[in-house]
Amino acid sequence: MVPEAKKKVLRFLIDTLNKNNIPFQVSGGLGAITYGATRELRDIDIEINKENCQKARELFKDYIVEDFRRYSDEEFDLWMMTLDIDGVPVDINQVEESYIFKDGEKILLPEGLIDTEMKSIDGIEFPVQNKKNLVDYKQMLGRDTDLTDATEMLATGQ
């Protein structure tokens, strides 16, 4: 589910953020995998507070594909920076002012790094968006992969 190359990048991200005292949470597919989803990991999604975006930009400047920007499409409206670390795509999102669109409605996502749960993959420990919020988010998005993730997450006791 999580290939060694992606685990190596995950370790680097976690070590860098922790060493520089930047609170964060993992969300998206990796978050779902820690709660029992069985799909292959495409990218790594990390959320940080707005106050740490500039610091993160400096720390990861050598890996930036797209700098922090307002990203908006038919599904999302949020601030994010995209990195490529050793071929692994990484999205670092600002946790505040993040929205999804559902049935034409713009919905504000929970703000702040609250109620995270410490999870681990092969001894790599990191805070993950809490299961309820992640399941709710994936169900609201309604994409096939997200619905499968939500179903698998709910079916496990992880």
Question: Which residues make up each language-model segment?
Answer:
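Short amphipathic alpha-helices in soluble, non-transmembrane regions
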Residues: 56-63
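Accessory recognition modules or surfaces
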Residues: 9-10, 34-40, 44-47, 76-90
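Catalytic cores of NTP-dependent nucleotidyl/adenyl transfer enzymes across multiple folds
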Residues: 104-158
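Conserved catalytic core of two-metal-ion nucleotidyltransferases
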Residues: 66-100
